[in-house]
Amino acid sequence: TQSKSTAQFFTCDAMDPASLKSCHEAVDQALGAPTVLLNAAGGNHPDAVVTPEMPFEKIPLPGWASVFDLNLVGGFLLPCQEFGPAMCGRGKGSIINIASVTSHLPLSKVIAYSASKAAVLSATRFLSREWATKGVRVNSITPGFFPAEQNRKLLFNEDGTPSDRAKAIFGHTPMGRFGDPSELAGAAVYLASEKAASFVTGSDIVVDGGFLSQTI
């Protein structure tokens, strides 16, 4: 079967309440009340990465705070505060947050990122309980390793070959490769679906090629 869909893009700053409010109003006017919120804002900061030159005890507070602001405030708190109450008022909605394998197992070097993503997973479960009786489901997706601009320097050498860190990831991933962004779509569609996932809340779907299942 074929269906006709309409897609529109709206820009906003996920760390600015006023910008989120304006975006919400624009979406309401153009497309109607949103029933799905996918919080995809997130990232890391070079001043929050442990290196030989900058050990843990030297991490500057601004670098640490910027990672938590982006991943927890912009990637969860403010968007949920803006869009969630309206969903609760209508009695239905699906909120999907982006966690990380670092939510489950902290990785070397990226301490602030790991800690902030662990907080996203915890906050997801908290909010799922708060809004369960209001018809709003709150879940998360844990992506494995997917190359993106924020991690490209860690995963690839200057000549484009996999870095030692990438090789270590492959060795710890039963499927032996990076994920493709398209492979996250199924999990998102499932969690967004009121029909398929109507009794699913407070859950985390892991899409990692088996990374978290590998020990020795």
What spans do the regions from the language model cover?
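Active-site Tyr-X3-Lys motif and surrounding loop/helix of classical short-chain dehydrogenase/reductase
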Residues: 22-29, 48-58, 62-70
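Active-site helix of classical SDR
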Residues: 80, 116, 124
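Catalytic Tyr-X3-Lys loop
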Residues: 35, 43, 57-77, 92, ...
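The beta1-alpha1 cofactor-binding region of Rossmann-like NAD(H)/NADP(H)-dependent oxidoreductases
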Residues: 11-23, 61, 182-183
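Short C-terminal tail/terminal secondary-structure segment
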Residues: 105, 189, 195-216
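Alpha-helical segment proximal to the catalytic Tyr-Lys
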Residues: 85, 129-133, 198
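A glycine/serine/threonine-rich, flexible loop-to-helix segment
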Residues: 51-54, 133, 145-172, 214-216
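Residue(s) in the substrate-gating loop at a strand-loop-helix junction
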Residues: 100
